[in-house]
Amino acid sequence: MTAAVWSYPKSGAGEEETIFNMVNAILLRIHQSGHLAEITDVQKGLVKEALDYYKTIRGNIRQAYPYWPIGTSSYSDNWSALALDAGKKHYVAVWRRGGEDRITLPMTRLAGKEVKIRCAYPQERPVTFGWNAAESSLSVRMEEEICARLFEVEVVSDEK
């Protein structure tokens, strides 16, 4: 038996709430639920995009090792991050729930490596991010107070 996380987008929820919901589940095994016939077309598009992306990475997820770039979070934390190390790919989920609009995530597992980073989900929503190779850190800025993004980090070379 394999555990999973329920994904339940609510009808009437905004785009960021739907994205937040989907990011909660993408790095694990998704049990998709909810009244999908009642959500908006925009929400359906976001759910579809998340599930399509999940299908491309689920093989890597099974073999990946989890780590928490800013430590394990508590309920009252403004920021949370969970990463999966799948060798040449790292998947980094970042959640903002208030506080400052930017955070820097130490990514020490990637020290000394040349990487390519993209916002994998959602691809067409605003987010500012950058890689600091000298510090092996990922900086993320999200303007919405409640939001989440999923980044894909590809190790291009094991040496800079």
Range-by-range predicted roles:
Residues V127-A133:
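Extracellular/luminal ectodomains and secreted, surface-exposed scaffolds of diverse proteins
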Residues M1-V127, S139-M142, A148-E152:
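Active-site-proximal substrate-binding groove within the catalytic cores of carbohydrate-active enzymes
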Residues E143, V155-K160:
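Mature N-terminal, pre-catalytic/accessory segment of carbohydrate-active enzymes
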Residues E124, S136, D158-E159:
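Non-catalytic accessory/interaction domains
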